[in-house]
Amino acid sequence: MKTTRLYLSNDTSSRAAGAGRLADAWSERPEIQLIRTSSRGAFFLEPMVERDTPSGREAWFNVAPDDLPRIVDAVGGTPVAGIPFLQQQTRFTFANFGITEPLALDEYQTHGGLKGFEAAQSLSPEAIIEELRISRLRGRGGAAFPVWKKWQVAQQTESEQKYVVANADEGDAGTYC
């Protein structure tokens, strides 16, 4: 029997929308291999299931457990590249969301993960801060404070002991995708 790989997100918002229920219902199905991924952020479409087809990755929206046969048969899917919500975005940090398993280091590396880290190891602290400045990367909070400025202030603070504080508030559902 041929096994079909299905991709189903495993973050808090997707689970709240029913992804966990699908995973439970399909966990022992021999015709599929269920890959748990991070979400693409289109929570209004969750639970969303994806699979690879000869014409590319396709998705099924608001899926129920009894939708499995049509997904395995690739009937009624929507090309992921054609989802309007995703077409409006250029993803950098979240480029692999919905594609890789978030906690699988080997998958992360296969998709280019750690290249930035490896490159940064040869840079000076000042060069890293300059790269952050050029990137225009900002915090995701309401102030959208420039990341480079935070790092520069930490670097320039005269102290033998420094602290980095991360705001670990998940007030926005799914923040820690």
Located regions from the model:
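Feature of Fe-S/electron-transfer and energy-metabolism proteins
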Residues: 1-177
